[in-house]
């Protein structure tokens, strides 16, 4: 009886140890396999995002794949420059009258096409339901004109409203402007020539004292790099011209 009880205890202990081993194996298998796949995903996404900045954490914790994100992203400066593919309303008599009024009042603000819809009763679906009345566009332009007169002077073309290509607004082209400084002095340099608005360029260019370089000074010392002198009048030709003027 004693031997049988000892054998039973050994068998039960052996079975319990085997059960513990199986439980440990199942536990570590269920833990390590997901960790292994997560590590593979992290390595793959890290390899895909090495050429892009600040996207490692986003690629790891985001549910969307990197390829789908790259397909959804659009380079606004890589789109082809084509005609705007926008559906315009029917060009009715009321629309023509509204455009004529807007053109006469001078409130177009650099807009190429004034979008207004026809009056009620002419048929068709209202393409602009946000406008309450057909004259809402004119009222909006009048309000812009009031703000422009009484508010601060803002160059609307300088913030990109003037260049509209389809469904996006592009940044404006830079326009050169000069500082009120004589360009032919020795102090003039590349810092003299800035980028600004055209009205500043016109106003400042009137105050510039443009003069020819002296015959004794070299061209490189008298002119800044942006200018190219094609021909410099010689001293003899200048004296000859002055003598002819005195004789006449």
From Swiss-Prot:
It is found in: Membrane. One of its GO terms (cellular component) is cell tip. Its main location: membrane. It is a single-pass membrane protein. The chain crosses the membrane at residues 23-43. One of its GO terms (biological process) is meiotic cell cycle. Keywords: Meiosis, Membrane, Transmembrane, Transmembrane helix. Has a role in meiosis. This is Meiotically up-regulated gene 110 protein. It comes from Schizosaccharomyces pombe (strain 972 / ATCC 24843) (Fission yeast).
């Amino acid at each position: 009886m004693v031997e049988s009880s000892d054998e039973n205890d050994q068998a039960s202990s052996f079975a319990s140890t085997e059960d513990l081993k199986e439980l440990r194996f199942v536990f570590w298998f269920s833990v390590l396999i997901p960790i292994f796949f997560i590590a593979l995903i992290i390595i793959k996404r890290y390899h895909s995002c090495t050429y892009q900045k600040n996207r490692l954490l986003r690629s790891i914790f985001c549910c969307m794949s990197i390829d789908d994100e790259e397909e959804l992203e659009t380079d606004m400066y890589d789109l082809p420059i084509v005609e705007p593919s926008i559906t315009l309303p029917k060009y009715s008599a009321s629309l023509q009258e509204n455009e004529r009024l807007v053109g006469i009042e001078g409130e177009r603000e650099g807009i190429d096409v004034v979008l207004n819809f026809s009056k009620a009763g002419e048929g068709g679906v209202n393409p602009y339901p946000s406008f309450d009345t057909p004259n809402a566009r004119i009222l909006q332009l009048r309000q812009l004109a009031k703000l422009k007169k009484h508010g601060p002077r803002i160059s609307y073309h300088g913030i990109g409203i003037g260049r509209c290509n389809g469904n996006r607004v592009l940044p404006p082209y830079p326009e050169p402007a000069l500082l009120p400084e004589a360009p032919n002095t020795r102090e003039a340099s590349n810092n003299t020539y800035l980028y600004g608005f055209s009205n500043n360029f016109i106003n400042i260019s009137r105050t510039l004292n443009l003069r020819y370089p002296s015959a004794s000074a070299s061209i490189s010392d008298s002119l800044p790099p942006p200018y190219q002198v094609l021909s410099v009048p010689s001293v003899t030709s200048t004296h000859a011209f002055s003598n002819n003027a005195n004789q006449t």
